[in-house]
């Protein structure tokens, strides 16, 4: 696949589940159709938002297969394959390739983080198992390691099949240093929804995030205008978008369940324990007010 397809606004797709916790193929198909209709540039599966680490290898394989089939090559698919063990991550990478995904991604070692060499040994095993473009997932909030941008960049560029990185951090200075060292050899996707326009100034070619499940069209519209020089569009939109995030992030899955049902007639189901919803009951008027806020703020 052409490297230039890895850009733009990608929802970190939610994984609809049935009451018994099994992924719901029908609702997944409906969500894929809705996101493509709304203009998603690609779909990122089975990450934190998609509850990937809480699903079995069998379930993750099925979700990947169903999504690839539903997308039918209309948008690229990136499957997150990070798991508790390197062996499981490698197996999931093979499954993603066999299912027809266009790229793979993975967080670093979950729970066990000895040093930077162990992190990149984990990545190396994943990247070498198939020929798909590989996008390691750097999640700054969960990393206990410190390293310089130069050290990180050198190890990143040495990985097999590396094409980019999902970089989830509020530190855009650090992101800019990474971009300055790696240039176009590493395509950076920002993972901080609340900074997706700001991240473009630090070298991000796109954004992958939870809130694009609801507002991919609006965010794509504003980002496109911003990149063409319409700074006022971003200045108007970003505070509204940040407000919407701030009042819903404490119960993100509960909010998404109500909002996606209202907007797309998609039921994502409940969360998988130990992940829980917070508020549980969102009034339609609350959600409608946020829909109106974002629509008005995104008008160019």
Regions found by a protein language model. Give the residues of each.
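Secondary-structure boundary/capping positions in well-ordered alpha/beta enzyme cores
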Residues: 74-75, 133, 162, 185, ...
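Basic/polar N-terminal segments that are highly enriched at the extreme N-terminus
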Residues: 1-3, 299-300
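Active-site beta->alpha loop and helix N-cap motifs at the rims of alpha/beta catalytic domains
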Residues: 2-144, 154
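C-terminal alpha-helical cap/extension of soluble enzyme domains
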Residues: 8-14, 34, 38-39, 204, ...
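Catalytic alpha/beta core domains of metabolic enzymes, predominantly
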Residues: 128-129, 140-249
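General structural feature for long, well-ordered alpha-helical segments within catalytic domains
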Residues: 24-27, 31, 59, 63, ...
């Amino acid at each position: 696949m052409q490297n230039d397809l890895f850009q733009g606004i990608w929802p970190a797709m939610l994984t609809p589940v049935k009451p018994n916790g099994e992924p719901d193929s029908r609702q997944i198909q409906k969500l894929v159709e809705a996101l493509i209709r709304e203009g998603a540039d690609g779909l990122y599966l089975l990450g934190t938002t998609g509850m990937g680490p809480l699903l079995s290898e069998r379930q993750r394989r099925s979700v990947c297969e169903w999504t690839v089939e539903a997308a039918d090559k209309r948008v690229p698919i990136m499957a997150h394959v990070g798991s508790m063990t390197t062996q499981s991550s490698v197996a999931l990478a093979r499954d993603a390739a066999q299912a027809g995904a266009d790229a793979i991604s993975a967080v670093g070692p979950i729970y066990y983080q000895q040093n930077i060499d162990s992190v990149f040994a984990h990545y190396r095993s994943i990247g070498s198992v198939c020929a798909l473009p590989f996008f390691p997932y750097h999640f700054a909030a969960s990393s206990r390691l410190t390293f310089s941008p130069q050290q990180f960049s050198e190890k990143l560029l040495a990985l097999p099949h590396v094409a980019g990185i999902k970089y989830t951090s509020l530190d855009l200075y650090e992101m800019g240093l990474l971009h300055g060292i790696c240039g176009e050899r590493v395509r950076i996707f920002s993972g901080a929804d609340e900074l997706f326009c700001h991240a473009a100034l630090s070298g991000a070619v796109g954004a992958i995030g939870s809130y694009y499940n609801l507002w991919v069209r609006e965010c794509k519209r504003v980002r496109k205008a911003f990149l063409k020089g319409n700074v006022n569009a971003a200045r108007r939109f970003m505070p509204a978008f940040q407000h919407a995030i701030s009042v819903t992030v404490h119960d993100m899955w509960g909010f998404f369940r109500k909002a996606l049902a209202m907007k797309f007639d998609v039921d994502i189901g409940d969360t998988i324990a130990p992940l829980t919803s917070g508020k549980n009951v969102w009034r339609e008027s609350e959600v409608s007010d946020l829909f109106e806020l974002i629509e008005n703020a995104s008008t160019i």
